[in-house]
Amino acid sequence: MMSKIVLVGLVGSAAAFNAPMMTVRRDAIATGAAAAVVAPILRPAGAAMKKNSKAPCVTIFDERDGCGGPTRAKTGAGEEGLMVKIQMQEIKLGRGAGAEYVSIFTNYDKKLFGVK
């Protein structure tokens, strides 16, 4: 008996949430167009596009090959000569931004002035 009551309740709730078939396609399209016009007006002020283009920039300092750095005692907790710096910087895009990246990437392992 309980299962029949649950079944009738489920069928009744499904019938209550059934979409009405009285709407015409033109009314649905008009409603969608009106919503598209009103949506930018209702957007919160915090959702506006930011004018500055800042991104996290990662700089890796690798001095494991030896340099005249600090002379304190080594702690033994990881790589002593390796440091990572993360900083928010403004990214300026221009015509040569892609070419500059390719130049840095391709020259990474090349010897400069006879020093590797």
Swiss-Prot record:
Q: Which GO terms describe its cellular component?
A: chloroplast thylakoid membrane; phycobilisome
Q: Which Gene3D superfamilies match?
A: Phycoerythrin alpha chain (3.90.510.10)
- Sites where the protein binds (2R,3E)-phycoerythrobilin 3: 64
Which UniProt keywords are listed?
Answer: Bile pigment, Chloroplast, Chromophore, Electron transport, Membrane, Photosynthesis, Plastid, Thylakoid, Transport
Q: How is it modified after translation?
A: Contains three phycoerythrobilin chromophores with binding mediated by both the alpha and beta subunits.
Q: Indicate which residues the UniProt annotation says bind (2R,3E)-phycoerythrobilin 2.
A: 63, 67, 85
Oligomeric form and interacting partners: Heterotetramer of 2 different alpha chains and 2 identical beta chains which form 2 alpha-beta heterodimers within the heterotetramer. The two alpha-beta heterodimers are rotated to an open configuration in contrast to the closed configuration found in other cryptophyte species due to the insertion of a single amino acid, Asp-65, in a conserved region of the alpha chain. In the open form, the central chromophores are not in physical contact but are separated by a water-filled channel.
What family is it from?
Belongs to the phycoerythrin family.
- What's the miscellaneous note? The light-harvesting system in Cryptophytes contains phycobiliprotein complexes. Unusually they are composed of either phycoerythrin (CPE) or phycocyanin (CPC) but never allophycocyanin (APC), with only one type of biliprotein being present in any one species. Unlike cyanobacteria or red algae these proteins are not arranged into higher-order phycobilisome complexes, and they are found in the thylakoid lumen.
- This chain's protein is named Phycoerythrin alpha-3 subunit
